[in-house]
């Protein structure tokens, strides 16, 4: 129930039609009797600067940030966390001591799922993509303890930049594979898709051999089963979509907004109704 003292939280990005954040956060607010409302705030890229300056003066207590604004938001914040600096992206904004601060909970959300899956750290992982999500995933797999990491992207230079930054920040070598040669890796590995290929429910970033794949992780959560995951299923390869990562990053946002981690099971139940 909205009241005169209801606190506003929201999601900024463009477009926002695919997002279920509105539903999961509001379901959790209702379940825990928190007097708050989570709203979608679609901001077109060309209007971003003016819009974000306006938002900073409105009674909004916290934000999630999605594509294409995760990198641009940094310039408008007073402080960002160490991991946000490393990744170069922020997906959670919170107000503390009258300062707007930024955190990256995509990193923590993905890391939580890796811990649950207990994937073999001795297997190499091949990460598809080199956008903001890929950066969070790269640092999460390093934190988890994978010994060998391959990275491939349609734009070779973007993958190269991530590898250079990781070498500088963590002194860890990431091997870059040209996109057109990604299927040539023939050792047993874990495949992680961070690209948007599959969002349309028709395309897949991997048409190669599944015999060398030990596990497939697609961070897309809608559709629930992307063509990549359907292929994994057909080839009897265990797989996971991005829903738990989404829920965990949402729960970790609450830690910055309210001082406690959000209710995972409540949010997940709501998400599963929608997908």
From Swiss-Prot:
InterPro entries referenced in this protein's UniProt entry, alphabetically: Aminoacid_DH-like_N_sf, NAD(P)-bd_dom_sf, SDH_C, Shikimate_DH, Shikimate_DH-bd_N, Shikimate_DH_fam, Shikm_DH/Glu-tRNA_Rdtase
GO BP terms, alphabetized: amino acid biosynthetic process; aromatic amino acid family biosynthetic process; chorismate biosynthetic process; shikimate metabolic process
Residues annotated for shikimate binding in this entry: 19-21, 66, 91, 106, 221
Active site: 70 (proton acceptor)
Family annotation (Pfam families): SDH_C (PF18317), Shikimate_DH (PF01488), Shikimate_dh_N (PF08501)
Binding residues for NADP(+): 129-133, 153-158, 219, 242
Any Gene Ontology CC annotation: cytosol
EC numbers on record: 1.1.1.25
SUPFAM superfamilies in the record: Aminoacid dehydrogenase-like, N-terminal domain, NAD(P)-binding Rossmann-fold domains
CDD domains per UniProt: NAD_bind_Shikimate_DH
Reactions performed catalytically: shikimate + NADP(+) = 3-dehydroshikimate + NADPH + H(+)
Annotated metabolic or biological route of this protein: Metabolic intermediate biosynthesis; chorismate biosynthesis; chorismate from D-erythrose 4-phosphate and phosphoenolpyruvate: step 4/7
Keyword annotations: Amino-acid biosynthesis, Aromatic amino acid biosynthesis, NADP, Oxidoreductase
MF (Gene Ontology): NADP binding; shikimate 3-dehydrogenase (NADP+) activity
Keyword Oxidoreductase among UniProt keywords: yes
Similarity remark: Belongs to the shikimate dehydrogenase family.
Stated role: Involved in the biosynthesis of the chorismate, which leads to the biosynthesis of aromatic amino acids. Catalyzes the reversible NADPH linked reduction of 3-dehydroshikimate (DHSA) to yield shikimate (SA).
NCBIfam families, per the entry: aroE
Subunit structure: Homodimer.
Protein name: Shikimate dehydrogenase (NADP(+))
Organism for this UniProt entry: Dictyoglomus thermophilum (strain ATCC 35947 / DSM 3960 / H-6-12)
Gene name in the database record: aroE
């Amino acid at each position: 129930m909205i009241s005169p003292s209801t606190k506003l939280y929201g999601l900024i990005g463009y477009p926002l039609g695919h997002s279920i954040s509105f539903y999961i956060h509001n379901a959790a607010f209702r379940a825990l009797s928190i007097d708050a409302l989570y709203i979608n705030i679609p901001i077109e890229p060309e209007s971003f600067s003016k819009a974000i300056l306006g938002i900073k003066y409105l009674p909004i207590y916290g934000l999630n940030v999605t594509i294409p604004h995760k990198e641009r938001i940094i310039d408008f914040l007073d402080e960002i966390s160490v991991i946000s600096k490393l990744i170069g992206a922020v997906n959670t904004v919170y107000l503390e001591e009258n300062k707007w601060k930024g955190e990256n909970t995509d990193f923590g959300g993905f890391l939580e799922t890796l811990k649950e899956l207990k994937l073999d750290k001795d297997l190499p992982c091949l990460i598809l993509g080199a956008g903001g999500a890929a950066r969070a995933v790269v640092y999460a797999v390093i934190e988890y303890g994978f010994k060998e990491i391959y990275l491939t992207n349609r734009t070779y230079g973007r993958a190269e930049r991530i590898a250079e930054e990781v070498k500088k920040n963590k002194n860890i070598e990431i091997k870059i594979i040209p996109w057109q040669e990604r299927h040539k890796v023939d050792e047993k590995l874990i495949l992680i898709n961070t690209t948007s290929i599959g969002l349309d429910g028709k395309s897949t970033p991997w048409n190669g051999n599944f015999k060398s794949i030990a596990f497939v992780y697609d961070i897309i959560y809608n559709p629930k089963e992307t063509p990549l995951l359907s292929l994994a299923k057909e080839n009897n390869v265990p797989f996971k979509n991005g829903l738990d990562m989404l829920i965990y990053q949402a729960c970790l946002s609450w830690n910055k907004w309210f001082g406690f981690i959000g209710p995972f099971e409540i949010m997940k139940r709501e998400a599963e109704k929608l997908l």
